[in-house]
Amino acid sequence: MRTVARGFFILCAIAVIALAALFVIELWQCGWSFDGKNSKNYTHTEQVITEDFTKIIINLKTDDISVLPSEDGECRLETFERKTMPHTVKVEDGTLVISFTEKDDLYSRINPFRFTSTYATLYLPGNYYDALTIGHKTGDLLVENGIYYDSVAIALSTGDVTFLADAIKDLEITTTTGDVRIVSDKTGEARITTTTGDITLTDSVVTSLDISLSTGEVTATNLTVLSDALIKGTTGSSTLKDVTARNLSIKKSTGNTTLDDVYADERFEVESTSGRVTLDGIDAGEIFIKTTTGSVKGSILSEKQFLVKSTSGRIDVPSTAGPICKIETTTGAIKIIIGN
């Protein structure tokens, strides 16, 4: 037993010494600067792109990627990157392709320490492009406003996505870990999928909306969905304020749902296993709310025919006629008033 314990402690000591050595080596290669500006392992580049293109594909391993409108009418790519992962730029068949070339040695692969952040910033001179496709592993992504894209597809492993532009036909964002923020005046079909992270939509107009997440909060403010909106989640709250849609559906397992000034032309439904549902001045052609554990309370703007059921909980709803409002809870009170 003592021999096993001694061997374990020896292995731990070796691991600590190895990590300390990697730390010192990386700091030395960064010119003994924690901001990495003096590092010999990094390089700053600036490249002007003169060929014409209508589509853009970006696949880099920099920490941060930004796509911005060009203020001087010049298409330009600025990067600060590791020398072992340089980028390449080419225009083929009307498509601008920006990608990295993997040249990592063993040290770069096993070293966990990084004292500087790399980035790539693309400045676009036009105000409309057919497609923007971005593949990114780790780092934040910004797509600034001022440019229209017909179609946008973003795939990110770890990092935050901020999309402030317009995707006229469709917008698809897929992330594993990180927050997603969207502000768009005119976007078509919007599909957002994330495993862990918050999703926020503000001051936006989309044709349709499909949100799917496992863990995280959904917040929508001043949002217009011209057709159907679907929000699916496992754990996390949903907060909607000043939202309109043709049909609105919220389905999740755990988390509170708060709706303020939310309107659906045809059908509005909420399905929740655990969590409160709070309504403040909402309305729809038909309303369906079903929860297992959690109360349903608030106000509806117009009179409804209430069909309510609670296995364990107090019920207090108006005796009015109108379109159907069906509310069911297993454990939780139901209290609804008409008016704001």
Model-derived features: positions:
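Acidic (Asp/Glu) and glycine-rich low-complexity loops/linkers
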Residues: 1-60, 64-156, 162-175, 181-194, ...
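Structural signature of tandem-repeat unit edges
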Residues: 163, 240, 259, 279-280
